[in-house]
Structure formats: structure tokens, C-alpha cells
Regions:
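Conserved, well-folded catalytic cores of nucleic-acid-processing
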Residues: 3, 7, 26-34, 55, ...
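Conserved segment of the helicase C-terminal RecA-like domain
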Residues: 47, 51-61, 65-107
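Amphipathic alpha-helical transducer elements in NTP-driven molecular machines
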Residues: 5, 17-21, 34-38, 66-77, ...
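C-terminal helical accessory/scaffold domains
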Residues: 126, 131, 142, 157, ...
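Conserved C-terminal RecA-like helicase domain
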Residues: 1-34, 62, 66-69, 146-149
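Generic beta-strand/beta-sheet core signal
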Residues: 11, 35-38, 54-55, 86, ...
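Beta-edge loop/turn motif
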Residues: 20-56, 64, 78, 191-198
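C-terminal or mid-to-C-terminal helical accessory/interaction module adjacent to the motor/catalytic core
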Residues: 87-174
Length: 342
């Protein structure tokens, strides 16, 4: 707060929404003159930055220290001199050596070509396949040839430039969708009721299928809060994953031991989710944001996103549970009617 009073502030993903709104609003109103930021403001924002200073072209990633791409640099310096606020903008790179090379590479260089992820990532292809089959078979089942034709006209296929690889990838994921019970191909491809529900939930079909496995555990009587939270934090869509620091490992071990039966049944081994799992467990136990922030050494914004992400996935899980409950009731009713008619 003292920094903001003096016209300077910082901006990063760990800020809670209230602080973020204040900082962005006051920066737009030019009451904040100097703003340091992580890549949260590097692209897609329109702020009155007359000058952008990049202190280093190196950044820590999951693979260690790496150079930022030319595209990232262009996005960063593109924040300076927005037409709505200024008639010019300045971009400065702090060079720790080799200024000529940096000038040639970043300032004069061409941004890297864009790459489509539609065919690179199985989850993306599954989502798009299910979506196409649903929309293309509104009145009649769609054919394999139509599916191939559609995807062969995408930017991803253009970059792939190999029809045989395209067909191989699509065939593999069509088999997966059938395995998950989301499409049929008796007289062409069309979605099942489960497939339609998953399509509207906008989630990876594999994630939805994995959730049904937990429903089976629930029906068998294995049901408690820790298990649901554990399942949610292990999903690929749960992106706020942090390993547990050593000082919390004992608390995590106690939780696991108390819920050992379910933990072993789920067969999850991703320890990177454990800190998020502890935060969620304390959140539903009514621990305040401030206490959680101090206890887990986590920023309020990170805790907020962990909570919101978990809420979204919990909703998805609830909808899948509702679907299978209604589906089971419908099948039971059909069975009773059939027995009565016979």
C-alpha cells in the first residue's frame, strides 16, 4: 500500500482480484507511474505504458534458464505506446553483454512461426473430434471420410503436410472416443448421450471418462471429501499444482494415512498436487485466505485460482454424476417396462 501511495506498484499472478483491479485502474488513471510486472502484462492488455523495460531476455522455465522467444519480446515491447494513450512508445532491453547480437536477434528478428496444437496434443484432438461429430451428425451420422476431409483443411493439417499421419492420429482418437462410450459408428459416427453431455461441459473426453471411474468407487461406498479433492487436483485441467514443502510433508502423510484405502484405490502418484490439495482441504475447513497465505507461504491470488479451478472441476464432476444417475434410472425404468410387457 505504501508503494502505491508513492506512485509505484507490482503486478503478478499471485495478486488477489481486488489488488489487481486497484493497480490496473490506477495505472490507467496514471496515478501509478512505475509498474513492475511478470509476464501477466506481457500480452493482450491495453495500458498506458510509454516505456517498457525488459531487465533480461532470460527466464526460468520448467527446463531451467532459457531465452525468451522473439514473439514474446515483440508482445512485451508492443505494450508501449498504445494508440489510445500515447503517440509513441519506447522499448529497452537491459543487456548484460552482446548488445549487437540482442539487437539483431530481437529487434530486427522475425517472430517464430505459429504452431497449431490441434493435432499435436491428444486432448485437443479428442475435444475437436467430439465437437465435429456432434455438430456434423445433427440429422444423420457422419462418415469417416467427412471427418478426414474436415481436419485435412485445418491449419494443423497444413503444418503436418502428411495425410497418412493425419489419418493415423484421427483413427487412434476415434477408437478412444468409442472406448470411452462417447461415440458409436454403427452406420456412421454419432455421439452418445454421454458424449453430448461431455461436449457441452467443454472438457477433455479422457478426463470425463476418468471421472466415471471415481463414480464407481463412490457407488461401492468409498466416498469422502479427501478422495474427491484428491481426484480433482490430479486432473490435467487442474493447473495450479505445487509440491508440498518439507515442513508440510508430515501433515500430508497424516491425511494420506487416514484416507489410505481411497488413496491407494485411486492409484494417483502426482505429488505435485499435494500443496494444492492441502490448501483446498483447509479452505473447506473454513481457514481464511490470510491464514492460508501465511500457513502455506502462498500468494492470495494463487489460492484464489486454486479454489476457482477446483470449483469448475467439481461442477463438471457433479454434472457427470447426475448424467450417470439419470441414465441408470432410465435404464432401470426401461427394464421394468420390458419385463412388464413380456
Amino acid at each position: 500500500a505504501q508503494m502505491v501511495k508513492n506512485g509505484t506498484a507490482f503486478h503478478h499472478a499471485g495478486l488477489d482480484q481486488r489488488c489487481r483491479t486497484i493497480i490496473e485502474t490506477e495505472y490507467k488513471n496514471r496515478h501509478i507511474k512505475f509498474l513492475t510486472a511478470t509476464p501477466t502484462l506481457a500480452a493482450g492488455v491495453n495500458l498506458p505504458a510509454r516505456r517498457v523495460v525488459i531487465p533480461s531476455v532470460m527466464r526460468y522455465t520448467s527446463n531451467g534458464l532459457e531465452k525468451i522467444s522473439i514473439l514474446e519480446y515483440k508482445q512485451m515491447c508492443g505494450r508501449a505506446g498504445r494508440p489510445q494513450y500515447d503517440d509513441m512508445g519506447e522499448s529497452i532491453i537491459i543487456s548484460k553483454g552482446y548488445p549487437d547480437e540482442i539487437l539483431e536477434h530481437y529487434v530486427d528478428g522475425e517472430p517464430e512461426p505459429l504452431e497449431s496444437k490441434t493435432l499435436d496434443e491428444d486432448s485437443s484432438l479428442r475435444i475437436n473430434l467430439l465437437g465435429f461429430i456432434y455438430t456434423a451428425s445433427k440429422f444423420n451420422p457422419t462418415s469417416y471420410e467427412k471427418i478426414i476431409k474436415f481436419f485435412s483443411q485445418t491449419f494443423a493439417a497444413y503444418q503436418l503436410s502428411d495425410d497418412s499421419v493425419l489419418e493415423k492420429k484421427i483413427t487412434k482418437q476415434l477408437e478412444k472416443l468409442k472406448e470411452y462410450g462417447m461415440i458409436t459408428d454403427e452406420n456412421g459416427f454419432e455421439p452418445t448421450k454421454f458424449g453430448i453431455r461431455v461436449f457441452y461441459l467443454r472438457i477433455d473426453p479422457k478426463t470425463a471418462f476418468d471421472m466415471t471411474g471415481y463414480i464407481e468407487d463412490y457407488v461401492r461406498g468409498t466416498k469422502h471429501t479427501f478422495g474427491i479433492l484428491h481426484m480433482i487436483t490430479n486432473l490435467p485441467e487442474f493447473y495450479s499444482q505445487y509440491p508440498v514443502p518439507d515442513k508440510y510433508q508430515e501433515s500430508m502423510d497424516d491425511l494420506i494415512n487416514k484416507n489410505e484405502k481411497l488413496y491407494r484405490q485411486q492409484n494417483f502418484s502426482n505429488e505435485d498436487c499435494f500443496k494444492s490439495l492441502l490448501i483446498l482441504y483447509k479452505w473447506i475447513d473454513a481457514m481464511t485466505y490470510q491464514d492460508m497465505s501465511e500457513h502455506f507461504d502462498a500468494e492470495p491470488g494463487d489460492i484464489f485460482y486454486i479454489k476457482e479451478n477446483a470449483k469448475d472441476l467439481a461442477y463438471t464432476f457433479t454434472e457427470i454424476v447426475k448424467f450417470w444417475r439419470d441414465y441408470a434410472k432410465e435404464n432401470e425404468q426401461k427394464k421394468i417396462v420390458s419385463e412388464y410387457q413380456n
